[in-house]
């Protein structure tokens, strides 16, 4: 892919086209690859954790909240 140009003395000048990857493009590909691996790895760990870890325990409901809920429903709280 060499382009030829003729100057005023009819000498032929051959310009070589730069072949290969631009260094900026190499950096972009490397960074994009690391980001892709990071997100794929996180997703794999998330799926693995969902399958293997037990579900979280719910916090116990306080007696005060239970009493308030029963009063809202119209049921008298025990002991009253």
UniProtKB/Swiss-Prot annotation:
Where is the major localization of this protein? nucleus
Q: Where is the composition biased (Basic residues)?
A: 55-70
Q: Name one GO biological process term.
A: regulation of DNA-templated transcription
Q: Where in the cell is it found?
A: Nucleus
| Nuclear localization signal (motif): residue ranges | 54-59
Tell me which domain of life the UniProt entry assigns to the organism this sequence originates from. Answer: Eukaryota
Which PANTHER family does the entry mention?
DNA-BINDING PROTEIN S1FA1-RELATED (PTHR35298:SF11), DNA-BINDING PROTEIN S1FA2 (PTHR35298)
The name this protein goes by in its record: DNA-binding protein S1FA2
